[in-house]
Design a protein with these regions (language model features):
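The feature marks non-catalytic terminal segments
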Residues: 9, 86-220
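Active-site beta-strand->loop->alpha-helix modules in alpha/beta enzyme cores, enriched
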Residues: 1-91
Length: 220
């Protein structure tokens, strides 16, 4: 299900680190504590270091690790940020976290309150409140005569997760994706991210032309 979803989104690679989802919890230390024994933390850290070194990513995007996020998701985000922090500053990818919100959310445009975490004396979850968050409007139209929106792509990807019934409740939900820069990002991170979001606005596929056989739906 995850692989089908990522294929629809155009992901190039899926890497699973084979760690146990032992139960639902909002306590990240159930897996991050050195004596937790749930995840092989040494193997995870080594794998992340190797992946970042080999792939030389421009960006690392995590979920926003808030106190009410699933503890495993918090842990995964923090481990990724740890790996970025272990790199020389000039070689780091830009690190961002994402939240999806409704268009009428009271906290739209406000920075998320993240759990406090540090590694090797560097605060991992401090975020930059300026510039304002980089955003993607899921209601942005596309396709023939702008009949679809980006929300349709998100919904089709979510719909692949049939074994997790609660996931289907997110179909059609969420209007705005907000992306916040972490302080541990390298110099010029804001400018690099701004350039990336400009590129994301470019159409991914050429517009199709429909002949008169399409009747009133023919291209104009």
């Amino acid at each position: 299900e995850q692989r089908r979803s990522l294929e629809l989104l155009g992901a190039r690679m899926l890497v699973r680190l084979q760690q146990t989802d032992h139960r639902y919890t909002q306590d990240r230390m159930e897996v991050l504590a050195e004596d937790a024994g749930v995840w092989d933390l040494a193997a995870v850290r080594a794998s992340l270091d190797r992946r970042l070194a080999e792939e030389q990513y421009d960006f690392v995007v995590t979920l926003a690790p808030t106190a009410t996020t699933h503890g495993h998701h918090q842990a995964a985000s923090l481990l990724a940020l740890e790996a970025v922090a272990r790199m020389p500053e000039a070689e780091r990818p830009v690190a961002l976290c994402c939240q999806v919100k409704a268009a009428d959310a009271d906290d739209l445009g406000e920075p998320p309150v993240l759990v406090v975490a540090e590694a090797a004396g560097e605060e991992l979850t401090a975020i930059r409140t300026t510039p304002a968050p980089f955003t993607i409007d899921r209601n942005e139209p596309f396709g023939h005569r702008d009949r679809l929106t980006l929300k349709a792509i998100a919904s089709v990807a979510i719909a692949q997760h049939l074994s997790q019934g609660t996931m289907l409740g997110y179909i059609g939900a969420g209007d705005v994706e907000e992306y916040w820069l972490f302080d541990l990002s390298p110099p010029l991170a804001a400018a690099r991210t701004a350039d990336w979001f400009v590129q994301l606005q470019d159409p991914s596929f050429p517009e199709r032309e429909y002949t008169s056989s399409a009747g009133t739906n023919a291209s104009r």
